[in-house]
């Protein structure tokens, strides 16, 4: 495997997104240090229409990589069908964008990035696709049973909670398996796969649980995915920072050490850990360049997003009581 692609949805406005450009600077600084631009055939940045020109300007700092900035509105017009505030779930919309990657990439395998992840060890395309299959990180399904059960309902399959599943971003996916998921959702529900997912905005499906359950159901996991073998690093470090109180105890030196496991780690953006603290923690291990950027804070938008979250919680509880999936 000579090259892979990458997809990275970016927002700069909203509750958790004000420092996403700075976080992307960290991500690309790590990629610059631990791999080369030639690893990637294309890195697709998918951006809301109103943020496209701004992100294009910031993306010049990453122009040594094969960056393509995509206007979300030109490809995701279906989002407009779900425009009521409680229907707008940015987390789900970004997951749909990730599953839509086959529209924008040509390679069989691609890595999914979020702005808050970064590399911790050297890698190439061959590292991520050993023997022609995607390097995959295990995670027990029963750690998060709700998301596996929600996705299983949409696919009419058993959630298999006693089995391992696919772990979080960054994750390697197959273009072919994404397309097969699109086909299966459309076949079951009789409409565009994206509409199926958008209509179920109050259900906690996720892109990876849907992808993995469908691949398992079709018996295709072993054809397209592989686990790390002895002597190979896993995709994820042994620990990432998922909650703010974990940052103090997170041992960066350990996770960047030559004898440590894992190619990537995460300092989750919704922890509200200051960007400066993240840079201070990581900069001893790779050079980081943070460009000047504007932090957008909109109190009205924040209030609207909070209302949306509260409304969805109520709908989710109601749907759970009814056992409902929307076609």
Which residue ranges define each predicted feature?
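Short, acidic, metal-binding catalytic loop of nucleotide-sugar glycosyltransferases
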Residues: 29-39
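Conserved donor-nucleotide/metal-binding helix-loop-beta segment in metal-dependent transferases, i.e.
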Residues: 119-152
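Short aromatic/hydrophobic "clamp" motif used to bind/position activated sugar donors
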Residues: 110
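Catalytic core and acceptor-binding pocket of nucleotide-sugar-dependent glycosyltransferases
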Residues: 161-254
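N-proximal low-complexity "stem/linker" segments adjacent to membrane-targeting elements
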Residues: 1-29
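Active-site-proximal specificity loops/subdomain of glycosyltransferases
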Residues: 58-103
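Membrane-proximal basic amphipathic "stem/tether" segments
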Residues: 1-2, 268, 273-327
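Short beta-strand/loop segment that forms part of the nucleotide-sugar
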Residues: 39-50, 69-74
